[in-house]
């Protein structure tokens, strides 16, 4: 998801997105630990998405 799309969402939607991404990251980590993860780039994408959501949340908190 692009940063511009994230900025249009409200705080509740961003928090829900963050919880969703953290759950997805947990699942991917478990798959990587057990050797079932085929597409390892997904870990990086999810980690980056989490950082983007947290950044937008912090920006909105400062407003």
From Swiss-Prot:
Q: Which SUPFAM superfamilies match?
A: Ribosomal protein L29 (L29p) (SSF46561)
UniProt key word Lipid biosynthesis = no
InterPro entries hit by this protein: Ribosomal_protein_uL29, Ribosomal_uL29, Ribosomal_uL29_CS, Ribosomal_uL29_sf
Keyword list, A-Z? Ribonucleoprotein, Ribosomal protein
Q: Name one GO cellular component term.
A: cytosolic large ribosomal subunit
**Which Gene3D superfamilies does the UniProt record give?**
1.10.287.310
One GO biological process from the UniProt record? translation
Tell me, what is one Gene Ontology molecular-function annotation carried by this entry? structural constituent of ribosome
Q: What is this protein called?
A: Large ribosomal subunit protein uL29
Q: Does the keyword Chloroplast apply?
A: no
Of which family is this protein a member?
Belongs to the universal ribosomal protein uL29 family.
Q: Which organism is it from?
A: Haemophilus ducreyi (strain 35000HP / ATCC 700724)
